[in-house]
Every structure is written in C-alpha cells, then in structure tokens.
Amino acid sequence: MKVITTAQAAALVQSGWTVASAGFVGAGHAEGVTEALEQRFLREALPRDLTLVYSAGQGDRGARGVNHFGNVGMTRAVVGGHWRSATRLATLAMTEQCEGFNLPQGVLTHLYRAIAGGKPGVLTKIGLHTFVDPRVEKDARYHGGAVNQRARDAIAAGTANWVEAVDFRGDEYLFYPSFRIDCALIRCTASDTRGNLSTHREAFHHELLAMAQAAHNSGGIVIAQVESVVDYHETLQAIHVPGILVDYVVVSEQPGHHLMTFAEAYNEAYVRPWRGEAAEAAERAKEAEVLPDASAPLDARTIVQRRAVMELAARKPRVVNLGVGMPAAVGALAHQAGLGGFTLTVEAGPIGGTPADGLSFGASAYPEAVVDQPAQFDFYEGGGIDLAILGLAEL
C-alpha cells in the first residue's frame, strides 16, 4: 500500500479503463479522488473514454459524486443502477454523448462478488420482462438496459454485452456477464500502515469489500480515500477491507470531501445501535434530526407518504424495505405516529432504526445491524421482506 495525493491518484487512471465507484446517494463516495479526476480531464483532456460502473446512484443532482465523470469525451459508457443523483451523466446520455445503461442495482452488487470469485457472471430472473430484458424481438420496450440510441447501437454492433437471455433447466433467466474492473474507487474512515481499512465513521459499508476484491482479482487497482492514516486500528471489527486488496490510500485533503453524507458532516445516530421501542426510537431519531417537521404544510407528497403509513398499520408486516424518493420518509412518519412491530431496511445495508431521507438516504438512525449491500440484496431477492414501499415515476 502506498499513500498518495488526490492528484497522484487521478494520474493513475488510464484512458479506456473500466472504473467502478463505490457509494450510495450522498454517502461513501470518494469525492476528493473523483473531483481530482475531473480536474485532470479538464486540464489535460485525460483520461478519456472511461467506462463507469456503479450500483447505487452517487451524487447530489448537481456537481458531486459520479457527476464528476459527466464531461464529453471523459466517459464513453455509463452502467449504473440509478441515474437520478447523476444529472450530469444523464445529460450526457440523453444527448447521445455516451452509451447509457441502467441495470438492476442488486445485480450489479452481485456482479462484483461474481467477478471477485472468478465466476462467469450472475444468473437471475431479476430484470426479466422489463426494459433490461435484451429480447427486443419479443417486445419493443425491451432494450437490454440501454437508455439511449448510442447504447442500443453498441448492443447491435456487439461492442456492448451487459445482459443475455438464456434458458436454464427449461426456464428463462437473464445472465449478466462478468467484466474486468481496472480501477475501484472506494472510501473508508481510516487506514493503518498496512492498508487495512476501517469504516467506523461511515453510515454503512455498501459494496466496499466485494468491489475491492473484484478489482484486485481482475488485475486492477484499488484506490481508497480515507480521513486519516493510523498506526493501528482500535478494534478488529472496525476493519472492513483488508490491506491485501488495497494499492493506494489517499488522505482526504478538504473537509468537504469526506462528509458522512452530502447533507451532514457527521451524524452519530447512523453508527450507534438502538434497541428500544418504536416511540423511544422515534424520540432518539428526532434528536438526530431525521424525523420530518410535523408542522410542515400538508402537500401531495405528504399525503402519499401518510397513505403508505396506513398500509404499514393495516398489513402489520414484520420486515419492510423502503425505496428512494417519497418512501424514504415513510419510516420516520410511522415512528412519529408511534407505530411499531416492524423492522425497516434499506438496500444500502441498514436493518432497523429510522431511515434517513434526502442526500442522507441509505443511512438509518440507530439501526440494529448493518450488512453489506450485496447481502442485503440476497435477502431481498430471496423473498425475505414482507412489504416494500417503492418510489416510481409512473404506474
């Protein structure tokens, strides 16, 4: 492991590489490194023609996060599980300045594990009979995950192959092939002198380990942004990425590059477990400023959210997933109403507690546990939840 500057990290990334970026909305993104990458491109027109891969959206719908890759010529293709946070990348795709692909978020996290394990890819039913399905001859709405004409042209030319339809044991599946990762950009809290990385001040650890393993076993490099380098870690449990996977460590050079989330410099509630009753948890969450203001005006958004709370009360589910957008505040409203008897989960990894909203979405105040994002999607895909409250553009 070698400690380098953000500028030195940016200089390592070569044109044509596939770069995987870890993070989740406003948390866990290596902001200092990606900002330096963008500055290098604007200064030198390098690196060019990158393929950017990320599972959860990472950004503030403005300039931060993976939006740093949103320059014409810098990025050739984008493969992401969520685009709303990455408005600059969306503009590139919609103006045909890059290939754009929208693949299932959970599948992408599982692909990191498959790549790490030397497996050919991920075989799943996730994405069947949706726009991710590549069988355009069956339905004109199927596009293999392509979000623009440039991506569809790449599929037709055989230069892009992110998903295939296959028959397996007499049933139909989608197969997502493994691919090489040349560089993984991850963020943790601290590194020791051997490169072992802790996450004790991070809201969650999403796909850090799987991504680092995937890049390392692809023959690529792993660049980790941290707050500090220490002689040793206080506890073994804090270490989430072992140093054998880490090539370079970058110490954050500006406070704004290592916020806990893009909305909060630090929130102790996201890393502290709480096992009390719902009413008490709601009070703690209120202290942590994650509950909505009860005196706020009653608008259409709040009415929809309260209607979802009524479903929680009526259905009495045991395990619930809350999606991004309007659903993110449902847990806080439910706790505010004193409802209990259920456990809220977020795909980033938190289980229990009160999920945060906005640019802190993905975190949870006083969770009972936090697991890796790929493991959370194992649980979801296997049918582990009783109720999901999701955000949709149109139904």
Task: Put a short name on every predicted segment.
Residues 1-395:
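Conserved alpha/beta enzyme-core scaffold
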